[in-house]
Regions:
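Kelch-like beta-propeller repeat domains
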Residues: 1-131
């Protein structure tokens, strides 16, 4: 709380399939409706951690899919404190993208496809339902 300068734990991000850690480093989020936050993009926890702890000279030479940037569309309900996985979409595999919500159309702007390679692509999808 801003006045008391105290934070509380709201919970944790859901793990990836197989139980791997999820990170949202480089991801982006936006409010949706009166009780939801949409979370998209970001780097892969294991790939990013390994690159920091054990740098390899060929790290930047891999194809984009090797980096396993997050393709998940996650929704967090601020009332129930529950995460819902709304699907996987290749268009969301970005780090450092911008995001906007216009009349339930979510727009993803630019971002990195892999370390050092940015895209000028702008992708949009219509959000058909949210709690």
């Amino acid at each position: 709380h801003p006045k008391t300068k105290q934070w509380r734990n709201e919970g944790f991000l859901p793990s990836l399939a197989g139980g791997s850690h999820r990170t949202v480093t480089g991801g982006c989020a936006i409010a949706s409706g009166d009780s939801s936050i949409l979370l998209v993009g970001g780097v892969n926890y294991d790939r990013f951690r390994d690159a920091l702890n054990h740098p390899e000279p060929d790290y930047l030479l891999h194809p984009a899919d090797w980096y396993k940037f997050n393709t998940s569309l996650l929704q967090y309900n601020t009332f129930t404190k529950h995460w819902t996985h709304l699907g996987n979409y290749e268009e969301l595999a970005r780090a450092g993208a911008g995001i906007a919500n216009n009349a339930n159309t979510v727009i993803i702007i630019g971002g990195e496809l892999k370390p050092g390679i940015r895209t000028p692509e702008v992708n949009a999808f219509k959000l058909t339902c949210h709690p």
